[in-house]
């Protein structure tokens, strides 16, 4: 991939795939690798994240959220708004809630759909989504 930074390549490698283990240690390594990201790397990740498998999208959301930088908000918001996988959207929502991010009102329908889904499943993440809804701007 032309122009892809070393940090981005490392991050993708650390995320692994469905066949690789994912423990707290792996999450920490992936999250720490984001320290080396350039603005180009963040833009690339935002454009690529939705093409990852469900498993890797979820890992990506966890790592970006764990990193806690405003640079990652665009990636988490893209996963929340557009991932076809509701479990991924739920992780992204929880991470955005942890970061105390105010989301645009336009996301209300997606958040409400996600809240209904999580409530039906008795997921503790439903509270995170409820908080996001209450702070829409």
Question: Locations of the language-model features?
Answer:
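Helix-turn/linker elements and helix-coil junctions of extended alpha-helical scaffolds
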Residues: 53, 83, 119-122
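Structural detector for internal amphipathic alpha-helices that build alpha-solenoid repeat scaffolds
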Residues: 1-2, 16-36, 47, 55-69, ...
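Amphipathic alpha-helical scaffolding segments comprising HEAT/armadillo-like alpha-solenoid repeats
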Residues: 2-14, 35-50, 69-81, 102-117
């Amino acid at each position: 991939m032309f122009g892809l930074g070393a940090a981005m390549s490392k991050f993708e490698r650390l995320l692994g795939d469905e066949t690789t283990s994912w423990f707290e240690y792996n999450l920490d390594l992936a999250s720490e690798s984001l320290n080396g990201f350039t603005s180009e790397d963040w833009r690339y990740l935002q454009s690529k994240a939705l093409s990852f498998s469900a498993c890797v999208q979820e890992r990506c959301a966890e790592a970006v959220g764990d990193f806690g930088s405003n640079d990652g908000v665009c990636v988490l918001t893209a996963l929340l708004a557009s991932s076809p996988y509701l479990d991924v959207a739920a992780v992204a929502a929880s991470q955005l809630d942890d970061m105390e991010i105010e989301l645009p009102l336009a996301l209300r329908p997606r958040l409400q759909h996600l809240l209904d889904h999580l409530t039906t499943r008795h997921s503790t993440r439903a509270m995170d989504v409820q908080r996001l809804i209450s702070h829409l701007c």
